[in-house]
Each structure stands twice: as structure tokens, then as C-alpha cells.
């Protein structure tokens, strides 16, 4: 995140109080280059204001760290970060403005954040405009779906208009290979729910066609459809659609798609926004 205030002015006004309190003082990010960071560490930044040296204890490094050799960021993202021109030290990019390949938007915490001006930033700006206003979201629904489709977290689709097979296939299209074991666990639970819906038994346990962990999701869907042909024609019930949305929230790791377009869409889309920078698929 970034501030609209001058770091130097904040430090000059509060440095004595902070040091008197004995707290560990760190500053950043957005320091720009090693020389600027070093000036805060040795305190020389304060000399220009006619003060004695005012060293800090540490600096925060964000974007440069993502582009470093050691970072798990994929190479395409590193290259994009390096090639984005950025802005001159001491200048600002106003909220919604695009300059130097950068824009200032709002994070899922509704705090100001600098972003590369790409499809993700455009989507973020649109979602910030509609907020949690259900009428505004409904009025711009098609625009939102299109914006989501250009990001790493597209809209899953209208679940109640899908067959059970299509729902399972769409999940695999958007989430496999699993980036986290909980994504695969959700799929296993979804398979179990679908099989329970399609089997003849109306209560109690039933003999499952799956006798162990699902290692090949595409093969599992074929096996399910062969055992229960209705999977190809029966549309998802409202109860199962609600189960699906609840399932996406069940584990800490968010799913790599937006399951439903509602008043919580901004949070659903923005949760865990940096994970895709590690995966070349995105």
C-alpha cells in the first residue's frame, strides 16, 4: 500500500517521540533505489532538512524483492516489473490515473495501492466503482464478467444453468493443476455431493464409484458420467449451487475464480491477489 503523505515530513514530526518510546522504526516501501534506502538507514536523509542524522532501524522492500533472483515470482512477472517505466522520485500517480505504466487503485482492504496498469488493475478499478451496491453490480454485470475474464480470477459461470458434468468440468478448467491441496479437496467434496444427488438412494449411504483419492480429475468426471448419465442433462439445483458457493469459502486458500457475482464480489476477486504471480499459467 502507499500513502499520500511525505515520509520525510512524517519522520521529521515524529522521530523524537518514536526514539524516546524505544520502538523499532522501519520505513518503506516505494523507496526507489538502494541509495535512497541507504540514506534512511544511515540517517543522512535528514541532513537536507537541517537536522542531525536520523537513522531508522530497517526498510521495507516490496516490488524489488518480487523481481529478485531468489523470489518465487514467475519470470514473465519479473520481466514486466523491470520493464514498467514507473514515475520520478517524489511524484505521485493520482487514484485512477495512468502514468509510467502505473496506476493507483484500491486493495481488498480499501487502501491505496500502486499497480501495473494492466487488465487486473482495470478490473480492480471497476469493482471499486460498484463497491457492494447490489443494484450497481447488477446494472454492470456483463461489464464485470468481461473484466474478470481478462484476469487470473475469471467468473465461474451461472451455476444453475450448468449441468452437473459441466460444473465439474468448469472447476477443473479453472483450478487444475491444484495450486493448493485444499483446491483438490474441494473437488473431491464436490464429486461426493454430485454423486449423492445423482444416485438412486434418497437417504443414507450409497456405494460410491470412487474407491480412493481422485488423482485424475478428468478421468473422475468421465467415470461419474458413465455411472450416472443424468450428469450430462440434469441442471444443478439451487441447493447444490448454494453448496458450491459455500464450498469455495470452506478452506483458507481462496479458489482461483469468482464463484458468484454478488455484493461481496470485490472481496471474492481480490482475496489472495498475489498467488498467481508464482504460476506461469497466469
What are these model-predicted stretches?
Residues 1-3, 7, 11-22, 41-282:
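Conserved active-site-proximal phosphate/metal-binding subdomains
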Residues 23-40:
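Glycine-rich beta-to-alpha transition loops that act as phosphate-gripper elements at the mouths
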Amino acid at each position: 500500500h502507499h500513502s499520500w503523505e511525505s515520509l520525510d515530513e512524517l519522520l521529521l514530526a515524529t522521530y523524537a517521540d518514536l526514539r524516546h518510546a524505544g520502538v523499532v522504526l522501519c520505513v518503506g516501501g516505494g523507496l526507489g533505489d538502494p541509495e535512497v534506502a541507504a540514506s534512511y538507514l544511515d540517517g543522512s536523509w535528514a541532513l537536507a532538512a537541517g537536522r542531525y542524522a536520523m537513522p531508522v532501524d530497517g526498510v521495507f522492500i516490496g516490488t524489488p524483492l518480487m523481481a529478485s533472483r531468489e523470489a518465487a515470482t514467475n519470470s514473465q512477472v519479473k520481466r514486466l516489473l523491470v520493464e514498467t517505466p514507473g514515475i520520478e522520485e517524489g511524484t505521485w500517480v493520482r487514484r485512477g490515473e495512468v502514468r509510467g505504466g502505473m496506476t493507483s487503485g484500491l486493495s481488498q482492504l480499501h487502501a491505496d495501492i500502486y499497480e501495473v496498469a494492466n487488465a487486473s488493475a482495470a478490473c480492480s478499478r471497476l469493482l471499486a466503482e460498484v463497491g457492494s451496491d447490489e443494484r450497481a453490480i447488477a446494472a454492470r454485470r456483463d461489464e464485470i464478467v468481461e473484466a474478470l475474464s481478462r484476469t487470473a480470477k475469471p467468473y465461474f459461470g451461472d451455476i444453475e444453468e450448468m449441468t452437473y458434468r459441466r460444473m465439474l468440468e468448469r472447476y477443473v478448467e479453472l483450478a487444475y493443476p491444484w495450486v493448493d491441496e485444499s483446491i483438490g479437496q474441494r473437488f473431491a467434496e464436490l464429486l461426493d455431493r454430485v454423486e449423492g444427488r445423482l444416485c438412486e438412494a434418497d437417504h443414507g449411504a450409497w456405494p460410491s464409484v470412487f474407491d480412493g483419492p481422485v488423482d485424475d480429475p478428468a478421468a473422475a468426471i468421465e467415470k461419474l458420467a458413465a455411472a450416472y448419465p443424468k450428469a450430462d442433462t440434469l441442471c444443478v439445483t439451487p441447493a447444490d449451487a448454494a453448496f458450491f458457493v459455500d464450498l469455495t469459502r470452506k478452506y483458507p486458500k481462496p479458489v482461483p475464480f469468482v464463484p458468484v457475482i454478488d455484493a461481496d464480489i470485490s472481496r471474492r476477486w481480490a482475496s489472495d491477489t498475489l498467488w498467481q504471480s508464482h504460476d506461469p499459467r497466469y
